[in-house]
Amino acid sequence: MHDFCFTIPYGMLLIGGGFIGYMKKGSITSFAGGAGTGLLLILAGYISLKAFEKKKNSTIAMVLQTVIAAALTLVMGQRYLLTGKIMPAGLVAGISALMTCFYVYKIATGGNKFPAKAE
């Protein structure tokens, strides 16, 4: 599976979560954090997709995706440990941990694989 197939929906999920946090609690921090990280992930996913279309891998996109997911895992994991609340901290920490593992796997295996050219 290609990284951008998960990265773009992951970014949209973070934006949506930040928006919901803002609407329910009036939290500008939730909105800014969700929108900021979500938009960066969508941008990284888009860069990766465009590189894939050229049969290349984007190291910058892979590193950016990994760093953001790892940072969210740490920040939201700490928040979960302090509050014990599954929503949103535990959920975001869990999803981000899975995404971090996925990105590390993609980096370790050489990035996106390209389909063989049919003759």
Curated annotation (Swiss-Prot):
The keyword Transmembrane applies. GO terms for cellular component: cytoplasm; endomembrane system; membrane; nucleus. The keyword Transmembrane applies. It is a multi-pass membrane protein. It comes from the Eukaryota. Keywords: Membrane, Transmembrane, Transmembrane helix. The chain crosses the membrane at residues 27-47, 57-77, 84-104. InterPro entries: TMEM14 (IPR005349), TMEM14_sf (IPR044890). It is found in: Membrane. Belongs to the TMEM14 family. May be involved in free fatty acids export. For all TMEM14 proteins, 4 hydrophobic alpha-helical domains are predicted. However, NMR structure determination of the human TMEM14A showed that only 3 of these helices are membrane-spaning while the amphiphilic N-terminal helix is probably located at the lipid micelle-water interface. This is Protein FATTY ACID EXPORT 6.
